[in-house]
Amino acid sequence: MKTKGVRMYGKNDLRVEEFELPEIKDDEILVENISDSVCMSTYKAAILGKEHKRVPKDVDINPIIIGHEFSGNIVKVGSKWKEQFKEGEKFAIQPALNYKGTMWSPGYSYMYCGGDATYNIIPNEVMELGCLLNYKGEAYYEASLAEPMSCIIGAFHACYH
């Protein structure tokens, strides 16, 4: 399926492109992005390119979709996740995975998973870690602001007051 998105190829090298998404695997989920917040972390990744700790070293060959604060609709569910997720449901994502000790994260590290695309593929590890969240609210932007709000709350609790 065709999608349009903002992909990073390196330092200060962002491109709006139309490209083909592969068919999802049994352990993946296809989603339609509706809202993606803009974050200074994304700006930092765009400036640093592969020097950013979450951006793959081969980003010039295998570009990633940027945007990690996103929400939208589930379009297609791989067989592994059909009991937990349904087509048409709304979702929000928690991008801080720390999967098996890696720094990989949606919006920084994956060729087919990021918020700045019309459609993307959520990889298995996101669901394995419970980071694809069902969203019951009305406004998609509220769901895409969940991650930055959690940063604010975490910073508040980390401060002496």
Describe the role of every protein-language-model region.
Residues 97-161:
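NAD(P)H dinucleotide-binding glycine-rich loop of Rossmann-like/cofactor-binding domains
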Residues 1-4:
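Extreme N-terminal starter segment of soluble prokaryotic enzymes
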Residues 7-14:
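Extracellular beta-rich ligand/substrate-recognition surface
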Residues 44-52:
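Short Gly/aromatic-enriched secondary-structure transition segments
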Residues 16-18, 119:
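Well-ordered beta-strand positions in beta-sheet-rich domains
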Residues 22-36, 51-100, 114, 133:
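Glycine-rich beta-strand-centered segment in the early N-terminal region that forms part
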Residues 41-44, 72:
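Basic/polar, acidic-poor N-terminal "presequence/leader" segments
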